[in-house]
């Protein structure tokens, strides 16, 4: 066994690649390797809150990473520095030590207890995927087989897969449900060939009732693994066993994926998950806060939801970062504290939201007219022309609809907005002075 500090630094390097930046910096960066007690690797966490979070969320990820680096499955125990006594070092859930040369027993389903249908927040971007997943869970291999869920990182694909597994086991405790990533499938397949255990490997994954395989896109370019998965897929499908697959893209967009696999992925139902809208993001934060027993002011949840619009993982990570920051500096949570806690993870280059009123204000300054003139009925050129420029910019620089733009200009009809946009666009093609004016206005707005 290598020096544990070096081992842990290597592990952190691998884990950093698998987590979002906010999650890694909030939970992993401050951990340190303490010691190795028998088969248990002792890791220090900065406080009780962090320790509990690491145990509930990242135990398996860390154990898998250590296994990949050492070939040994060690128990992982988190402790707080000031409480390090002999009793603290006793592992809560020891993991059987196993060398890579020894055959594994039937794999555990590895389902996260927090990923259930009850904890999944339904929104416009995931409603269909949720309904399809529930249908599959209620009637495995009878509704959609395979079910293929795709979408960006951290949008809830893995959550739905775990939820399917939990539902099946809850309603049929004897069911053999296995969840794993395609990367793990690949690694185990390679090890089985090296150790001459291919038959054991095949029996392990072809004798299940439900196979949940995550991030299938990592099979791209791995010809032998694709061959093995092809036969695994066929065996399960022919025996009416449920297959659920996730990916960051639809089958047709996975490069170097064999056509025969691609076609099989398309046999069942393909559904996507898109980033959550503002209302869904707020609902996710509320549910997360309730699940963790956190009292978070509405203004803070609104602030986080407005700032983090990429995915659920970063959204929840931001919430926990705010809570952890509040705990560390011993201050109440409010919007100002949230802004301070998240300043390092919210891009400073986040595009400014430009409003129609912003445009009217800057155009008014440029042409020396009052804000009320934009809504007035005046038709003099000194007012009408700047108004048309403002309408043009509102169409170009905001997401507002034509009726909405018209409403902000004194309730004018949408055809008036179209006319203004067309007129200014035509003038810009050969009017250098106007081009310069528009450029200056845009620079001030940005």
From Swiss-Prot:
DNA repair in keyword set: no
UniProt remark on domains: Domain I is involved in oligomerization and binding regulators, domain II is flexibile and of varying length in different bacteria, domain III forms the AAA+ region, while domain IV binds dsDNA.
Protein name from the UniProt record: Chromosomal replication initiator protein DnaA
What are the GO BP annotations of this UniProt entry?
DNA replication initiation; regulation of DNA replication
**Domain IV, binds dsDNA: annotated segments:** 327-446
Q: Record's SUPFAM superfamilies?
A: P-loop containing nucleoside triphosphate hydrolases, TrpR-like
Q: Which UniProt keywords apply?
A: ATP-binding, Cytoplasm, DNA replication, DNA-binding, Lipid-binding, Nucleotide-binding
One MF term in the entry's GO annotations? ATP binding
| Organism in which the protein naturally occurs | Bacillus licheniformis (strain ATCC 14580 / DSM 13 / JCM 2505 / CCUG 7422 / NBRC 12200 / NCIMB 9375 / NCTC 10341 / NRRL NRS-1264 / Gibson 46)
Q: Where is this region: Domain II?
A: 72-109
Q: Which gene encodes it?
A: dnaA
Where is this protein primarily located? Answer: cytoplasm
Which InterPro entries does this entry report, sorted A to Z? Answer: AAA+_ATPase (IPR003593), Chromosome_initiator_DnaA (IPR001957), Chromosome_initiator_DnaA-like (IPR020591), Chromosome_initiator_DnaA_CS (IPR018312), DnaA_C (IPR013159), DnaA_dom (IPR013317), DnaA_N_dom (IPR024633), DnaA_N_sf (IPR038454)
